[in-house]
C-alpha cells in the first residue's frame, strides 16, 4: 500500500501536485507470477495501469497446496488464458499468488487473507486448498482446478449442479488405462506399488480406483501411506522385492518428491508409471493423461464467465478435459532397464529422449 507524507509547511501548489504524482507512480507494483512461499505475507500488488471496459480492476487470489510442475502449469495456463481474453496482469487484474507449502493451516490462513482483501475470485489449485477456501467463505466465487473428485471432497453437491459458490475443473485420471501401460511394459507384472498421502482425499480416491482397476487386469496394489514428503523414499524402499512396478498418482505430496521414488526405481530397475505428464518429464517412464496447462486454460474460461456476470458457480457444471495423451520417456526407460514397445512409441503424442 502507498504511504502518504503529510506536508508540515506551505509549499508552492505546483510542487505539491508534482509530489503527489511521483508518490502515486512509485507505489505501483507488479504481481509476481510465482506464488509466495508458506503463509501469506503482505497484500496483493497494485496494478500498473489500464482498466477494463467497466473501469474495474479485479483482484484474484490464487493458492496452490504445494509447488510442483503440474500445479505450476495449471496456474500459468490460467493466467495466460485470462490475458488472452483481456484480463491482463498488472493492467486490470491483480493476482495474489500464494503457496501453502503443503500445510492445511497455511491454506486456511491464505484463504482468510483473500476474504479480508475482498477478492473478486479465488482460484484454488488442488483439493486441500479448495477445501480451505470453501471453509473460509461462502460469498466469494471459488474456482478449483487439479481436483480429482470434488464430490468426495465435499466441494460440490454434484458434478452437474455444484450449488453454492464453488465449481471448477477436475483432473480425474484414466487410472485403468494408466495401469495397462505397466502390463504393456512388463507383461508378467502382478504387483504394483502405490505411495500416497493418507491425509488427502484426492489420493485416497485414486488408490481405490487403482485397486479396482488392478483387479480387472489381474494385478494387485501394494500401498504405502505417508504423511510427509520426507517419508517417500523410505516408503519406496520398503516395496523393493515386493512390487513389479510403481504407479505414482496425482498425489501432490508424492509428486513434489517424485525424485525419491525415481532414485529407488532406477537403482532397483523397477518401472515407474505416472498419473500426469510432468512426472514423466521428471523421470517416470510413461503416462496417459491430461495437460495441466490446458486444464488451467479451461478453468480461466469459466472464470471469465463469472467475472463478466454471465454465470454463477452454482449453475456451472464441473468440467473435465476431453483429450488425453500418451507421453513416454525413453531415457527413463533405459535407466530402469525397460525396452519401450514400438507400438507404444508409435502412438505416443510426445516422446522424451533427452
Residue ranges and their predicted role:
Residues 21-25:
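C-terminal motif of bacterial Sec signal peptides marking the signal peptidase cleavage site
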Residues 27-30:
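Bacterial signal peptide processing site
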Residues 47, 55-85, 96-105, 199-203, ...:
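Extracytoplasmic "Venus flytrap"
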Residues 60, 78, 167-215, 318-332:
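An alpha-beta-alpha
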Residues 94-116, 224-239:
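Structural motif
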Residues 100-157, 248-266, 270, 275:
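Beta-alpha junction/loop-to-helix N-cap segments that form part of ligand/metal-binding clefts
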Residues 150-189, 291-311:
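Hydrophobic alpha-helical segments within soluble ligand-binding/sensing domains
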Residues 308-354:
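Hinge/cleft segment of the Venus flytrap/periplasmic-binding protein
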Amino acid at each position: 500500500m502507498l504511504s502518504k507524507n503529510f506536508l508540515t509547511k506551505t509549499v508552492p501548489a505546483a510542487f505539491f501536485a508534482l509530489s503527489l504524482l511521483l508518490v502515486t507512480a512509485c507505489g505501483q507494483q507488479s504481481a509476481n507470477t510465482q506464488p509466495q512461499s508458506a503463509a501469506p505475507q503482505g497484500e496483493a500488488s497494485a496494478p500498473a495501469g489500464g482498466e477494463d471496459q467497466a473501469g474495474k480492476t479485479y483482484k484474484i487470489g490464487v493458492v496452490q497446496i504445494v509447488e510442483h510442475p503440474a500445479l505450476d502449469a495449471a496456474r500459468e495456463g490460467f493466467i495466460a488464458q485470462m490475458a488472452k481474453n483481456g484480463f491482463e496482469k498488472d493492467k486490470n487484474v491483480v493476482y495474489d499468488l500464494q503457496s501453502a507449502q503443503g500445510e492445511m493451516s497455511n491454506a486456511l490462513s491464505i484463504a482468510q487473507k483473500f476474504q479480508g482483501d475482498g477478492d473478486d475470485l479465488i482460484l484454488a489449485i488442488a483439493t486441500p486448498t479448495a477445501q480451505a477456501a470453501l471453509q473460509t467463505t461462502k460469498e466469494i466465487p471459488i474456482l478449483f482446478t487439479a481436483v480429482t473428485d470434488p464430490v468426495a471432497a465435499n466441494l460440490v453437491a454434484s458434478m452437474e449442479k455444484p450449488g453454492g459458490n464453488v465449481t471448477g475443473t477436475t483432473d480425474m485420471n484414466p487410472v485403468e488405462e494408466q495401469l495397462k501401460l505397466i502390463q504393456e511394459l512388463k507383461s508378467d507384472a502382478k504387483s504394483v506399488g502405490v505411495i500416497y498421502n493418507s491425509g488427502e482425499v484426492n489420493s485416497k480416491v485414486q488408490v481405490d480406483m487403482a485397486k479396482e482397476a488392478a483387479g480387472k487386469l489381474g494385478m494387485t496394489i501394494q500401498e504405502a501411506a505417508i504423511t510427509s514428503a520426507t517419508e517417500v523414499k523410505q516408503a519406496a524402499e520398503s516395496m523393493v522385492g515386493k512390487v513389479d512396478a510403481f504407479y505414482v498418482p496425482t498425489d501432490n505430496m508424492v509428486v513434489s518428491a517424485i525424485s525419491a521414488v525415481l532414485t529407488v526405481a532406477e537403482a532397483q530397475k523397477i518401472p515407474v508409471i505416472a498419473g500426469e505428464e510432468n512426472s514423466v518429464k521428471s523421470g517416470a517412464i510413461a503416462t496417459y493423461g491430461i495437460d495441466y496447462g490446458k486444464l488451467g486454460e479451461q478453468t480461466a474460461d469459466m472464470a471469465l464467465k463469472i467475472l463478466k456476470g454471465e454465470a454463477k458457480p452454482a449453475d456451472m457444471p464441473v468440467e473435465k478435459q476431453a483429450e488425453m495423451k500418451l507421453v513416454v520417456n525413453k531415457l527413463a526407460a533405459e535407466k530402469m532397464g525397460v525396452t519401450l514397445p514400438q507400438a507404444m512409441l508409435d502412438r505416443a503424442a510426445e516422446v522424451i529422449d533427452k
